[in-house]
Amino acid sequence: MKTGESTAIDIAPETNNSGPIGKKKSTTPLLAAPVPDRGTHRMKRGLAIFDFVLRIGVLASALAAAAAMGTSEQTLPFFTQFFQFEASYDDLPTFQFFVVAMAVVAGYVVLSIPFSIVCIIRPHAAGPRVLLLILDSVALTLNTAAAGAAAAVVSLAHSGNSSTNWLAICNQFGDFCQQASGAVVGSFAAVLLFLLLILFSALSLKNSH
């Protein structure tokens, strides 16, 4: 080496596992937690609130139907020495089944309301929604069976059946038939609301995937 000559020594920058010194260490996690979409969250909460309102409607319809049928009774103002002409819901097993079935449906709806509230608080919770969907389907089946059977008897009471010599009793027991008909209408209103409940539950579960 000659005098006056300078020697340059290149020193590579020290590195570590996170990169060169002086650079900020990355803090990005390997697996980032998914952030729920706000639009989906709002829609699910809206469906849950609508579910709660529909359940109140089903409860009112089922209770009204059971009460109307359970209190349907009429006694004609004339009678003989041995007979008194009276019509009551407990004279027909179909109407008895109707009252029991609608009372069971109303009781189920009362028990399902807390789960509906849970779905409002936690819109993305799929467990309560699946449970409600299954139990709503069972309640809908029972409701439809009771409503259909009672509707057939009410129709027969209004029109009769000439082939079997069954007379139309509504010509004499008009108030009884009117009250029973109102109960059947209320039960079919509950059926319609149950269908909406199941539809919105399925829609909410679909959007969770």
Swiss-Prot record:
This is Casparian strip membrane protein 1. Residues 1-46, 118-129, 204-209 are cytoplasmic. One of its GO terms (cellular component) is plasma membrane. It comes from the Eukaryota. The keyword Transmembrane applies. Residues 1-35 are annotated as: Disordered. InterPro entries: CASP/CASPL, CASP_dom, CASPL. One of its GO terms (biological process) is cell wall organization. Glycans are attached at residue 161. NCBIfam families: A_tha_TIGR01569. Belongs to the Casparian strip membrane proteins (CASP) family.
